[in-house]
């Protein structure tokens, strides 16, 4: 991340490392402001922000004077898994962090596209929307920009829509449960977790 350049229009603060450190600071403020006390939740939110741009070194390029990092959110999954696997063997934790990494741009993408409630429901099947909005907000605020109000627009919009659907802070429901696998003939094992 150190030395991985970013477009100065969107990231005047400098390289990806500086941006990531600023995002961590912003997330700490958000967690304090939101009175989030659950230690496990705080941990996966912080690791979500720490890992959110790990894909940038693999895709950053300069084209016609513009620096882009297309698909960095997807390319960040593999290095996130590699990093997190050195710290823990808790699959659920790693999956939660990687889901935040993979989807951290979604609130802005959905907002800018004025997406339907159906699209928001699809997102809900992948990630806790409230947690995602916290990571997205920290990402947006973790840079040297003057108009910080724009950071709140997308996340507030998405949370409002999710609240309409009553899915803003729902746990992700398992699409396949252990009993479904047993019914298919699988024997219970650690792989079920």
Predicted regions and their residues:
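Divalent metal-dependent catalytic cores for phosphoryl transfer on phosphate-bearing substrates
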Residues: 15, 28-153
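A generic alpha-helix surface/boundary motif
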Residues: 21, 74-78, 114, 174-179
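Charged substrate- and nucleic-acid-binding regions of tRNA-handling and nucleotidyl-transfer enzymes
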Residues: 39-42, 82-86, 142-193
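Active-site flanking loop/helix segments enriched in acidic
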Residues: 1-24, 57-66
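Short linear loop/turn motifs
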Residues: 2-5, 97-99, 190-193
């Amino acid at each position: 991340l150190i030395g991985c350049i970013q477009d100065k229009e969107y990231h005047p603060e400098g390289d990806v490392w500086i941006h990531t450190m600023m995002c961590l600071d912003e997330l700490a403020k958000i967690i304090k402001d939101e009175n989030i006390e659950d230690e496990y939740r705080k941990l996966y939110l912080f690791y979500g922000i720490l890992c959110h741009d790990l894909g940038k070194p693999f895709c950053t390029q300069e084209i016609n004077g513009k620096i882009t990092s297309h698909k960095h959110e997807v390319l960040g999954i593999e290095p996130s898994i590699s990093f997190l696997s050195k710290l823990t063997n808790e699959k659920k934790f790693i999956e939660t962090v990687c889901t935040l990494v993979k989807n951290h741009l979604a609130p802005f993408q959905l907002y800018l596209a004025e997406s339907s409630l159906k699209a928001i429901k699809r997102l809900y099947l992948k990630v806790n929307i409230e947690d995602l909005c916290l990571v997205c907000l920290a990402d947006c605020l973790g840079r040297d920009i003057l108009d910080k109000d724009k950071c709140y627009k997308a996340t507030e919009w998405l949370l409002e829509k999710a609240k309409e659907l009553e899915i803003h802070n729902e746990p992700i429901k398992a699409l396949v449960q252990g009993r479904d696998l047993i019914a298919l003939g699988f024997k219970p094992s650690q792989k079920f977790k």
